[in-house]
């Protein structure tokens, strides 16, 4: 299993939001995410909830046919920031 993403989208994230998939891939690989949720608006998609720079981010993803995690986008989430209060991860092991 690998974590993959679209490089064009990654460049756009770096330009527009000052973040990158690499940052969140590292958080995910090290199991430092807060939660994994079903995406209520997309039936085959899940969301990693992560903290970065003291703010809560949503990282929607899918699993491809080879069980790779395909990151779709990253965005700051007021909804999850209110819900989780900006807390950092708890060990997932």
Indicate where each model-derived feature is located.
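Ribonuclease/tRNase effector modules and their secretory precursors
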Residues: 1-93
